[in-house]
Amino acid sequence: MTSTARSQELDYLKGVLILLMIAFHLVYFEHLHPYAKQVVYTFHMPAFLLVSGYLVNVAKTWRQFLITMMWIAVPYAIMESAYTIAASMLPVSDHVDNLTPALLLDKVLLNPLGPYWYLHTMVICGLIAKAAHSLPVGNTLRLLAMVIVMVVVSQSPLTLSLPCAMYYLAGHALRTTGQPFTLFFPSTLLAVLPFAVLAFFPTNLDKATPGGAVMVYLSVCSLLAACRLSGNRLRQLFSFLGRRSLLLYVFSPVFTLSAKVLVPFLAFDPTGFLFLVLSLLLAVCGSLGIGYVLDRLHISPWVFGKNTL
């Protein structure tokens, strides 16, 4: 399979995963489907971290690599600051009492609040991967060094979920072997059946358990099979969203919060799926709209390091 085809499959995978993330950040919908939320939370962010670890390019020079990390850190810092300030004023589950400049810095630098922890984790793990790559040893020892540093960091004041870091490491380890992502994760719908069996037992609904790890693997295989079987237009749509997953990740929380205003008008649907569809449209179109405005105002290079989003 060509690198272009593999890239489209990874973009498709990211597109599906970002929609799942948005869907289960809708408080109304997740409360209606708590078990589905548990199942999705078992695999969607671990799968994202696997892909991120696989795609990180540690062969760049330190200068090039730090620039790449900076353009993840800048939108993260802006939105994490905004989220923390909003959480100090709004009656949300992550409400912050007595916000001070020191507490704000703590949330941005050490202990992220809300949905932006993934970007924080990406920067930390990316820097660890690059530092390990710089060691004058073989790949096995570099990966071992990454494990040690990740364990140490996870025990420090700097928030880093060790299970999440291990999924990033797994993706990076796969990349160092030179094995194609789609060879290690074969696209097969046969993965759906064992996934469903594992999901039936609540003890497996934890990414840090062996059952949870197998569910992550099977979910990726299943989604890659869905990519292969999708029509061209649907595949292009999800790939389009996958290429803009950072934009959607950064701005969608604004719209998942705003979607609450739809609840009274859609309460007649006991499943919440109408609310889900309309909220996803709002979040996706709204986020892409913000990206368009940032492009037109020439702000994108200052926030994302790109002329167009």
What label would you give each PLM region?
Residues M1-L309:
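Alpha-helical transmembrane segments and their immediate juxtamembrane cytosolic regions
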